[in-house]
UniProtKB/Swiss-Prot annotation:
It catalyses: O-phospho-L-seryl-[protein] + H2O = L-seryl-[protein] + phosphate; O-phospho-L-threonyl-[protein] + H2O = L-threonyl-[protein] + phosphate. It comes from Drosophila simulans (Fruit fly). Its cofactor is Mg(2+); Mn(2+). Keywords: Hydrolase, Magnesium, Manganese, Metal-binding, Protein phosphatase. Pfam families: SpoIIE. Belongs to the PP2C family. The gene is fig. GO terms for molecular function: metal ion binding; protein serine/threonine phosphatase activity. This is Protein phosphatase PTC7 homolog fig.
Amino acid sequence: MITRMKNWPCLLKRFSIQQFHQFTHLSGRLERAPQSGKSSRDPYLVTVVQGRSKKPRFPGERSNQRFGEDSWFVSSTPLAEVMGVADGVGGWRDLGVDAGRFAKELMSCCSGQTQLSDFDGRSPRNLLIAGFQELSHREQPVVGSSTACLATMHRKDCTLYTANLGDSGFLVVRNGRVLHRSVEQTHDFNTPYQLTVPPEDRKESYYCDKPEMAVSTRHSLLPGDLVLLATDGLFDNMPESTLLSILNGLKERGERDLLEGASRVVEKARELSLNASFQSPFAIKARQHNVSYSGGGKPDDITLILSSVEVPSV
């Protein structure tokens, strides 16, 4: 992914299939603190997080809630379960900027907003707006840009609310089939919509998309549904059919089974990203846009949040 800048002669930076061979790895179950006001009969999400960085982290880089230039958060409130992923735009590396820091700070701001008393869990787009405003209005804001995909499951009506800006995204899987899938927002090939805080002296050089441009959706959920949020490192390398074949192999929906399934998805996406002969979704899109690309997968950071909708046993 790149930063879109006005008057740049080339919008695509080629990826070398041999460039990234080592991936750092992190996964985990999420421990939830009890929530006052939450009914013991409300539906809830069993959630795991899995991911890989496309290359080893540099010394001192914080690993918490980051996979390379990707970031994520999960939050639980009395009204809703909330999760989000963000993909820092890699083009900032050429300007000497940590491309993942902006994504990390954006997710941190969004997570903090969920703890405010007026958060009702039904508008992740408003959550994204508030999180971005908090980040961009700091006295010394973090420079950079990222995509963002947020989702909330409101407990009382068991409804999934989403807001997606860029080419990260979400899936809802029911009975082995994709029930809903987000649609990418792009300016051009490999140039997604992105939230941006530009350098103070170069504001006119950047296209700055607004959080209000995020696409919002609403979907009723049922017990047993799977909700998946991921960055483009997954979607650019793994066909939907391959993803479903792994998810449909889950025998149970407990944390251990979900974590095993999420790990298999990430490992397979990593494998495909390094396969120079694989006709990946990214390679297919490049061909559709008449972009010269040697084919194969696209080495990238991969972040995945996988949740199963559950109801308390009586």
